[in-house]
């Protein structure tokens, strides 16, 4: 049975999409069958994997509102071992479309449960906000992976996210757990990065991955080329970091 991980942080600009793309690609590189679900209306995971968002006929939006079937949405083998449920700006209309729909929080779960046995990992890139898409993603997921940028307001975003996870656990998905925290955009030259890491460790009694994602020029360039970092520059510090994170995710004992 595939392990479903929602990559989430209600604070934008923390490396959420970067982590979704590159963790997924590195898992696929290691021979794992991966399905990536782009649940963010910005569609940056979709474009970061080399697809033109404007040309897509079927996306997560059409699936969520019942206009097409899951097999019509999944784009197989975007990379070796990696398939994609894409998104574009149309997904921003889902909130309004689903007003009054019964059990709308379970729409994604109902569909993904049909195919989870076909994959080792299903990675969901959540939007940076609390809305019906985030709730659907967390209701579907086994765990939540939390990227945290090493910056001054890191704890503020984290406290909001923990509150959301608790609400989902209480009302929709009691088995949801925190997969772990991964620090992103880390700059060892600054005292701030070091302080943020220590503050989060003090605040959160959860798994914190040993791998820390550094600030890296090649990592920042890769999305504009529609490539994950392990393909764009396989020897870069960013590629090495995400390969290490993939190893940790694979090794993490899961119940």
Regions found by a protein language model. Give the residues of each.
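P-loop NTP-binding core
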Residues: 1-255
């Amino acid at each position: 049975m595939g392990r479903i991980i929602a990559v989430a942080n209600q604070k934008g600009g923390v490396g959420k999409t970067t982590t979704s793309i590159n963790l997924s690609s590195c898992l696929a590189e290691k021979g794992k069958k991966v399905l990536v679900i782009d649940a963010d209306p910005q569609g940056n995971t979709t474009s970061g994997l080399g697809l033109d968002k404007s040309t897509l006929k079927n996306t997560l939006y059409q699936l969520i509102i019942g206009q097409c079937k899951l097999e019509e949405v999944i784009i197989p083998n975007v990379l070796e071992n990696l398939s994609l449920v894409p998104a574009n700006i149309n997904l921003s209309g889902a909130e309004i479309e689903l007003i009054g729909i019964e059990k709308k929080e379970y729409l994604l779960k109902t569909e993904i449960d049909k195919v989870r046995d076909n994959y080792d990992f299903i990675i969901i890139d959540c939007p940076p906000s609390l809305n019906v898409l985030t709730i659907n993603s967390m209701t579907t997921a086994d765990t939540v992976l939390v990227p945290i940028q090493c910056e001054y307001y890191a704890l503020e975003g984290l406290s909001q996210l923990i509150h959301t996870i608790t609400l989902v656990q209480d009302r929709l998905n009691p088995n949801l757990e925190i997969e772990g925290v991964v620090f992103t955009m880390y700059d060892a030259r600054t005292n701030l990065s070091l302080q943020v890491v220590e503050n989060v460790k003090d605040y959160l009694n959860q798994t914190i991955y040993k791998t820390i994602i550094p600030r890296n020029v090649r990592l920042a360039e890769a999305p504009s080329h529609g490539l994950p970092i392990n393909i764009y520059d396989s020897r870069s510090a960013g590629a090495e970091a995400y390969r290490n994170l993939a190893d940790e995710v694979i090794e993490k004992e899961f119940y």
